[in-house]
Amino acid sequence: MELKFNLKGAFKTSTDPTGAKEVIAQYFDEANNTILKKGAPEGQGAKITQWDIVDGSIELTIESGRYVRAHDAIMRLKKPLAAKLGKEFRIGIRGVDVKKFTISMPAEGEIGNMNIPHVSNISKVEGGLILELNVGESELERRIPDRILTLMEEKVRAKDYGGKAEHWQILWESDKKEHTFAGDPTQEMMKHGWIKRGASRGQWIHGPQSTKMFRTFEKIVYDELLEPLGYREMIFPKLVPWEVWQKSGHAKGVYPEIYYVCPPKTRDPAYWEEVSDHYKVTHEVPTELIKSKIGDPIGGLCYAQCPPFWMYLQGETIPTDEFPIKVFDKSGTSHRYESGGIHGIERVDEFHRVEIVWLGTKEQVIETARKLHERYMHIFNEILDLEWRKAWVTPWFMAQEGLTGLSEQGEAGTTDYEAPLPYRGDDGEWLEFQNVSINGNKYPSGFNVKSQTGEELWSGCSGVGLERWASAFFAQKGLDPENWPEEFRKRVGEVPKGIRFL
């Protein structure tokens, strides 16, 4: 099936246009051979297939393919027609009425149930889908039909990508190692009082021993990577409003995984008195009552750590000699709502991360990523002595832009670092414990960041998840310092004593 648009609409006029019928006919004939073909390959323009004057308005049907789309065609027709009718007949066009609008698009297999804004029905036919749109002139002007089509094409491509979220290609793998430990590190850390579950789901309280390990990991990253490569520390916000996620692109699909932030409707104590009184009497927090007193979500807690940083650069033009800009943030927690039941420290809702961000020309960004890979390899091989592998990962939304495959590995995409967890067995799933992403021009473009020379800017990011590092390291080495690599043991120093309980 080829992509087709079919729009039945009407120009609403200030008075009956019957007297102008001959002029309208001549204008539509000319338009079919001029403005409705402009910008399209031969034979690929839009076409008015029929029209008539009905109930004092000009009704018409427009059919088109991908190039001059029917909704663009009717808007192209409006202004010249209004000028012609106004000048010759003193008839005005008051607006466009969309009576029926369908898009036929190619798609194989089942897409599943969907509830798309401004789409009243989706029908499956041989070789494709038929979308019935519920739109008016305002939606045409805002290009809502184009956004609907883009969304549907993304969904089809995501499904055609094999039902997988990512494309995965191994790049490098360490030698297989003999592991001195085969237990679950989370259970072992709990058993020895290193960690305890927090009050919230997916949250942990880290005792002195675990905290010492996290600080050691951070120091290794700083000493071996951040300082030698010239990164500067910053503090990024941890409450992220919708505006940031709209510009970063996360607003397209972040909703199942974020913790939402809703402010009070007012800070007036009198407004909240009944909530306080309810708790004082019942010793129960009245969550339903609270829902009625808080505002709409303004955004969420930090999800991906780097987007808020970009507000610092938004709208700025940066001198050439400032590039590459290299910064990092380790100032607070990130939050993601994890599905399923109870997990260990390898999968948490609240986690600790060092976020590394860099910005420059395409060549500078790629070279910066290469140096990061070198330093990570040094850390994982020479200091932590891990068994691990490196894989090229292209999310499907990048794959649809042609960024998959070995030929693109030096450019946009993500490299994951994965480690086996011995307690999961020889065939167990490996843990992704580190990544390096080259994001192309996505963030500089989204936040309108420019170079002094006008050269296109790219960026990259790399998140050091301390829980993931701990999970990989302690799953392979255990908690006994005697089984740790000498270089790591030297950097830890003495493991602090935990807090004793009766």
UniProtKB/Swiss-Prot annotation:
Biological process according to GO: selenocysteine biosynthetic process; seryl-tRNA aminoacylation
Biological or metabolic pathway of the protein: Aminoacyl-tRNA biosynthesis; selenocysteinyl-tRNA(Sec) biosynthesis; L-seryl-tRNA(Sec) from L-serine and tRNA(Sec): step 1/1
UniProt superkingdom: Archaea
Localization: Cytoplasm
Organism of derivation: Methanococcoides burtonii (strain DSM 6242 / NBRC 107633 / OCM 468 / ACE-M)
Domains (record comment): Consists of two distinct domains, a catalytic core and a N-terminal extension that is presumably involved in tRNA binding.
Annotated keywords: Aminoacyl-tRNA synthetase, ATP-binding, Cytoplasm, Ligase, Metal-binding, Nucleotide-binding, Protein biosynthesis, Zinc
Protein name according to UniProt: Type-2 serine--tRNA ligase
Binding positions (ATP): R336, Y337, E338, R347, V348, E432, R468
Role according to the record: Catalyzes the attachment of serine to tRNA(Ser). Is also able to aminoacylate tRNA(Sec) with serine, to form the misacylated tRNA L-seryl-tRNA(Sec), which will be further converted into selenocysteinyl-tRNA(Sec).
Gene responsible for this protein: serS
Similarity annotation: Belongs to the class-II aminoacyl-tRNA synthetase family. Type-2 seryl-tRNA synthetase subfamily.
Broad EC category: ligase
GO MF terms, alphabetically ordered: ATP binding; serine-tRNA ligase activity; zinc ion binding
SUPFAM superfamilies: Class II aaRS and biotin synthetases
EC number annotated for this UniProt entry: 6.1.1.11
